[in-house]
Amino acid sequence: MASTFLSAQSQNPFGIPSEEAPAPSSNIVAAPGSRAQGWLNQGRSEVIARHGVVATSDSLAAQAGLEILQQGGNAIDAAVAAGSVLDVTSQNDTGIAGDLFALVYIAAEKKLYALNSAGWAPARWTPEFFKKELGLDRVPVTGVNAATVPGAISGYDAMLNRFGTMGFKETFERAARIAEEGWGQGERRHRDIVSAEQRLRQDDYSAEVFLEDGKAPHLYSIIRNPDLADALRLMQEEGRDAFYKGAIADAIVAKVQSEGGVMTHADLAEFESEWVEPINTNYHGYDIYQLPPPGQGFAALEMLNILEVCAPEHGVNLAALGPSHPDYWHFMVEAKKLAYSDLQAYNGDPLFSAVPVTELLNKNYAASLCDRIDMDKASEPSVKGGLDGGTIYLTTADRWGNMVSLIHSVFSVYGSGSAIPP
């Protein structure tokens, strides 16, 4: 990940020793599986900072978050700034029309908050609509009828309104400038756009914005997106209403309905992010938190339960084995298969289906799965997936001890493949 940090007047947990925290570094733990236990040839250096950290998959985004911290903003402001830059430079994975989930830790309250900003389905999305009107047996993966109401902008707004010190005016500035002036397309994004050429060619505006004569731009090309810059500038002036009730909403509805979609102004205007209670498990003394459904985080917690409960049953000591031992990876993979099987079987929208999170995260349930792990052979995965993906992760921490952990996604590479013209 691209990381950056700053030097300024410090407060713990990243600062100099104080009466309240005589050894702040005592909270920094080198986990088994780090460079000290097997990754001796890892090329990237750790980032160690006293006053705040921004970690993203893109150096420009990390720099944007850093700028906000230098200006006196907090971790929430920095997360929105970094995320908005990724909405420009990483549209293979994310964008202003994506969804967002965030965990926000407020140090002054010693409390963790969870934000679900996954957009809901248009009101007319029913099984009958897809089966009878479109002749489909499932929701498509491309085109306007693959896209739900965008949740990301509402999520940014909710975070800033509740915990931030800035607004879109400040936090979107770097993103808007990058969209106007351009950025370099590196290897990862070039690979993704090459793989998505056919998807993008199916949409005239996507082809115009992302391709050159129907082909992916050359590696290391400088990319600009002035229309996206205009949208960001509009939101700097008018806030979230520009997206959900104003000119951007008009453009979304016009595009979707012109191509047989059923998203309406009401679908957009009525959407609100939701603050929810985080879920958690305890793994060897550490409390680990995730978003509840419809987020997929309970699978990670279930996997940790399986590792903790089942490893001793099989005589496996993961810490002692370390990441250079095949049994370490075998056990990890088998635990993940079991957790992902339950994810696919049970996860859904809790407004419409009961997801038995409490039962799935009970350690007695994890114990019931132990005999399904065979240390001598791999099990058959219950779900087979492709290599496609479209998600970013970022995290921020500030001098006051506030922290944000955020996922922002368009589900697959370049999402539905449909872009909205101005």
What are these regions (language model features)?
Residues S10-Q63, E67, A75-E238, F243-K245, ...:
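Noncatalytic scaffold domains of N-terminal-nucleophile
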Residues P32, P312-V410, A419:
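Internal maturation/activation junctions in enzymes
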Residues W120, F411-V413:
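A short acidic/small-residue loop/turn micro-motif
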Residues F298:
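Flexible, polar/acidic helix-loop-strand segments at domain edges
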